[in-house]
């Protein structure tokens, strides 16, 4: 049952990642429409051969996924709006919150350390 609970907790993060990747793929395909093939000197590179082979293998799956998700009507502006709202709600004050938490943790740890330390070693030297 514990494994199922962990899977359910990870599901929203996984869905967000899949959604972001699908939107990025859709935006990139729109940006590359109408471009020609790479120049001949790039075609001969081994890395470009690997890239082209991966593209051959993955392009049908990406196209099918994009077609299936098309009914959602997601666009770049929709994703940007969602990400901006998420940032405003959860991440805007992350720096100050983290700094405060670290200072409180440090103070708490020092207090625990002093309480465990023998009086002879940790006595205030006033």
Swiss-Prot record:
Gene Ontology, cellular component aspect: high-density lipoprotein particle; very-low-density lipoprotein particle
Keywords for this protein: Lipid transport, Secreted, Signal, Transport
Magnesium is among the record's keywords: no
Principal localisation: secreted
Subcellular location: Secreted
GO BP term, example: lipid transport
Domain of life per record: Eukaryota
Signal peptide: 1-27
Pfam families reported in the protein's UniProt record: APOC4 (PF15119)
Keyword Transmembrane: no
Free-text function comment from the UniProt entry: May participate in lipoprotein metabolism.
Family as reported in the entry's similarity comment: Belongs to the apolipoprotein C4 family.
Protein name, as recorded: Apolipoprotein C-IV
């Amino acid at each position: 049952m514990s494994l199922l609970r962990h899977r359910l907790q990870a599901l929203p993060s996984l869905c967000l990642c899949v959604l972001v990747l699908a939107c990025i793929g859709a935006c990139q395909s729109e940006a590359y429409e109408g471009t020609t093939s790479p120049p001949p000197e790039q075609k001969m590179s081994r890395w470009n051969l690997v890239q082209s082979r991966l593209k051959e293998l993955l392009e049908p799956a990406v196209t099918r996924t994009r077609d299936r998700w098309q009914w959602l009507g997601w666009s770049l502006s929709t994703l940007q709006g969602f990400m901006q709202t998420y940032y405003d709600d959860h991440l805007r004050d992350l720096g100050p919150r983290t700094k405060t938490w670290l200072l409180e943790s440090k103070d708490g740890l020092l207090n625990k350390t002093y309480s465990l330390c023998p009086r002879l070693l940790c006595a205030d030297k006033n």
